[in-house]
């Protein structure tokens, strides 16, 4: 009988890095999906991510989710 290989039970993290575009100036910036501090745009200073206790609430447009 051949040996059957099951699923490898290695937990994967749910948090990722995301690239956000600022709605005011168009600057693209990389931040953490579960940010614990307020993330501001480096060019104009607008708040891009607000911490909520879990995932951050994003004010800008999410351009790409980085792996």
Swiss-Prot record:
Residues binding Zn(2+), per UniProt: 22, 25, 41, 44
Pfam family, one: Ribosomal_S27e
Zinc finger (C4-type): 22-44
Cofactor comment: Binds 1 zinc ion per subunit.
Recorded GO MF terms: structural constituent of ribosome; zinc ion binding
Key word Ribonucleoprotein present: yes
UniProt keyword annotations, A-Z: Metal-binding, Ribonucleoprotein, Ribosomal protein, Zinc, Zinc-finger
Cofactor: Zn(2+)
GO cellular component: a single term: ribonucleoprotein complex
Taxonomy, superkingdom: Archaea
Gene Ontology BP, a term: translation
Keyword Transport: no
Family: Belongs to the eukaryotic ribosomal protein eS27 family.
Subunit structure: Part of the 30S ribosomal subunit.
NCBIfam families: PRK00415.1
Name of the protein in its database record: Small ribosomal subunit protein eS27
Species of provenance: Pyrobaculum arsenaticum (strain DSM 13514 / JCM 11321 / PZ6)
Organism phylogeny: Archaea, Thermoproteota, Thermoprotei, Thermoproteales, Thermoproteaceae
């Amino acid at each position: 009988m051949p040996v059957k290989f099951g699923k490898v039970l290695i937990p994967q993290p749910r948090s990722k890095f995301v690239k956000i575009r600022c709605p005011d100036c168009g600057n693209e910036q990389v931040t953490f999906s579960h940010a614990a501090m307020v993330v501001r745009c480096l060019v104009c200073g607008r708040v891009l991510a607000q911490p909520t206790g879990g995932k951050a609430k994003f004010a800008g447009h999410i351009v790409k989710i980085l792996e």
